Regions:
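Flexible "arm" and connector segments at domain edges
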Residues: 1-105
């Protein structure tokens, strides 16, 4: 099994457990796929534990995904708020199945 790990993990493992095998990913497409897997892992950890600190891991992975995709997350975030709004009003929609696609950007 392999998965993306943070930069300092090999050193931390070597200090406590001994050997840590790892490799550096050079291929951007593979790195992007590993980041997507990591995002799923981190979201599942948050959903399982409900720990707010897990959100930091999610945000970190999202930041790296945006970097690889060469997109400005802040710009996209602000654009999405302008076009679709936020969640300030705490609205809940009731839709027949299947749910409508609304401004999917």
């Amino acid at each position: 099994m392999y998965k993306l790990i943070r930069d300092l993990i090999p050193e931390l493992i070597q200090q406590t457990e001994g050997i840590c095998n790892y490799a550096e990913v050079k291929n951007d497409e593979f790195y992007y796929a590993l980041l997507q897997d990591k995002l799923i892992e981190e979201v599942n950890e948050y959903l399982a534990t409900g720990e707010i600190t897990e959100l930091v891991d999610i945000i970190t992975v999202i930041k790296y995904i945006a970097d690889v995709a060469k997109v400005d997350l802040k710009e996209l975030y602000e654009e999405k708020l302008k076009t679709n709004g936020g969640f300030d009003k705490r609205l809940v929609g009731f839709f027949p199945d299947p749910q409508p696609e609304v401004n999917q950007k």
